[in-house]
Structure formats: C-alpha cells, structure tokens
Amino acid sequence: MSRTRIYELDVFRAICTITVLLGHVSSYPVGVLSTDSRFYGLYLGVNSFCRFAIQAFLFLSAAVLVHSYADRWQGPESALAMWRKRLIDPGIPYVVWSVIYTLLAIRRGRHIDFPTFLRLLATGKAWDHLYFIVLIFQFYLLFPLLLRALRSLSCRPVLWLGIGALIQAGFHMWDQRVFAIPNRASWAVRFGFYLFAGMLAGLDFDVLQDWTRRNRWAIAAVWAVSAVLNCSVSAAIRLGTPHRLSGYAELIVNVYAVASCLFFLAVSQWVTALNGWPMRAAMGISNASFGIYLSHPLGLAMWRRLTATGNPILFHLSVWAGAVVVLALSWAATLWLKRFKFGWTLVGK
C-alpha cells in the first residue's frame, strides 16, 4: 500500500477529539447537578453518547500505525526508529502535562508525594484523560510482535478479529470473576478488539472504505439502535434504577463503540467528499489534536473557575460556551506553540 495520506482518517480524528471534549464538558454537570434537574438527562445523554471516543481513538491509532509502517518494516531497525519517534516525541509532553495536572490536583488539596506521582505517571492517572497515552505506549511497545502476527493472519481476517475479541473478553471476565485488576482502564488489552480491528483496517483501508459505503444505511441503523440502548442502560446504572439489560452493559457499550467507529467513518467519507469548510476545519483540529487532547481539561478547569455562578441559566450557558471557548483556545494555543523550537514539549510534533 502506498503511504498516501488518508484524509478520512483526519476527519475521523477530529470527530474523536471533539467527542472527548464533549465527554469532559458533560461529565461536570452530571457530577454536580441534582438528578431532579430539568437538564440532567441532557447532560447524561451527551456523556453516554461520548463513550465510544477512546475506543475509536485506539482503532484510529492502530490503523494509522499499520498504514505508515507495514510496507516499509525492516525488522529491529524499524522497531527502534518507530519507538524513538512514537515513544519519545509524545512521551515528553505526556510527562510535562502529568506534572502540570499533578500540581493542579495538589492545589485542589490532594496530597501527592513523589512515589505517588510515579505511580500516577505509570498508569496515566495524573488526570482523567491521560490513561489513553499509556494505552498507546503499550501498543507501540507491542507493535513489532503484533505486526508480525497480523502478516501471518492477514488472509484470515475473521480469525484475527476473533483473537482480538477473545483477548478483550478474557480480560473483562478475569477482572469481573477471578481477580479485580488494578487500574483496569490503563491496560491496552482491555481494548484488544479495537486495536486488532484498527491494525487490520490499516493494511488496506480501501477495503473498509468500500464496505462502509455499501452498507452505510445498515451501519446507521445499528448505530442508532445501539446508541439508544447505550444511553438508556448507562442512565439506569447511573441513577440506580432497574433495567432489564443492565447485565449486558459491557456488551452494549462495545456494540455501540464498534457501530460508532463504522458510522463516523462513513460520516468522515461524506465530509471528505464535500471538500468544503467542514473538512478544512476537521483537518485543522486533526493537526492540533494531540495538543488539544492534552490541554483541554486544564482549560475547562480554568473556565469553570472563572465562570462559577449560582444562576441556573448562566450555569447551563457557561457549560456549552466552555466547550466552544476551550476548543478554540486549546486549538489556537497548539498552533502557536508549534511555531517555537521547544513548543513540541507541550503539544507534540
């Protein structure tokens, strides 16, 4: 496969970035509002809607990595070059932001000594969103072995996807029925299916593109049904109300996440085909996505402090205005920092 840029994946990355932001925007009112609030259901629905973002980001990262390296992989030399680029370049911003968020947590009254900080750094727990970076680092470390396995099974895609699903299901069953795994969100195997599916897609993305075009209406239908089920079950669990499907919550959220990956890939194809301002905006967000991802929780924390109010109307306005303002500022700050020699230590290269 030629190493051409796949613009649909840039649009997809922008969608994932905005979804992560919306998830963090909506989680705050879900946590502070009374369940009797008129708008509580709206915030809870938006938050539940965003539950596919990390899975989609992992799928995307795996697809991009295979697309970038599969045809030019030369064994150990390629592995070392890939690790230098993919571990060090994002690793330094990760450490810097872990320090920043640790200082923010200390300022809010949390006691964190140096050994605790090292544990937070290793597990991505310095702030709620940083565990994703740890997941990606694990995938990068295992990538040479996984790529070799993928090449052996590329002609048997169903088996490859089945192995990914079994790894993920096995992790879940072990955690639920054998031994509660510490920091379960920080283990890449928890999302094994999405990584395996992304790697398979990266081998020949045109195949997936053609399939989603042919089946776009079926994908949309499955996505809509799974979205409703995900939101209703998530709401029932959050509110502690009975729901006949509560026992299948893990399965439902995974069906929803898979359907969302396919649905928003189809949306990305449509946006790319239009080739208008939505695509240009998506490309801009995609190019700044790492900086936006790392910095936006700090922006949201500052915004909430500046706009704190007891007025219900102003509170709701500030929630949604904060999403727009923080996206714009983190995007602009990323572009600005990239102009400087050492700006990459904050926003990546």
Locate predicted features.
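Functionally critical transmembrane alpha-helices in membrane proteins and complexes, commonly lining
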Residues: Y7-A70, P90-S98
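Specific transmembrane alpha-helix
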Residues: I54-H67, F137-L147, G170-W211, V253-A273, ...
